[in-house]
Amino acid sequence: RDQSFPGVVFDAYISEPNQTGNRDVNEQAMADFRLRIPSIPYLIPFPAGLQLYGEAGTEDKWSQLPVPSRTAFLGGLYIPQVFQGDTLDLRIEYADTDYGRRRHPELRQVWYNNSPYTSGMRYRGFPLGHHMGTDGTDFFVRTTRYLTDTLQLGANFNLQERDRGQPVHEKKREAAVDLTWWYSKDVQFMGGYTFQRLTNP
């Protein structure tokens, strides 16, 4: 059938969801943004300002406004330079594929799964998207700092819950540290240590 743009997009989102025949498609929509805010005395005290970024998506039609019933989202804050004359940066990020299920408990296992296409949005069993998978939440913090012109130290912390719609589900607590040697602008070597505590009854 004709797959020309933009007709196929309108056809997929104006028609009823989950149809059969030549309208049997996996319907997804996403929007993302990045906002750069310059340094403002007393308000944004960071020398290089900061960045706010985010992404929101929905499975099977944007069925409810302003927030779809099957929505998932990611939001973050990035500070490229925390202190004047220093290379310390900071990233704080939160992602949620469980938001729709919490609002509508009957909508479980929506993200990265699909009933007509039983493999879902996956490759070899892994989701083509956020590693927390469906019905999950993820909180992530990372900072890096150059010790020399070619040696960079990094550390991160991660709290994650997967498949929260199940009676018992996996919880992960993770802390990591890494060291990167920039041999050249195109070649780098990295070593690190990660500690994880998994609760998966």
Report residues per predicted region:
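Extracellular/periplasm-exposed beta-strand and loop segments of Gram-negative cell-envelope proteins
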Residues: 125-132, 176, 194
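Short glycine/proline-enriched coil/turn segments at helix->beta-strand junctions
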Residues: 147-149, 185
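Predominantly the C-terminal beta-signal and adjacent terminal strand-loop region
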Residues: 176-201
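Compositionally biased, low-complexity repeat tracts
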Residues: 116, 125, 129, 182-184, ...
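Signature for the C-terminal beta-barrel architecture of outer-membrane proteins
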Residues: 1-117, 134-146, 153-176, 197
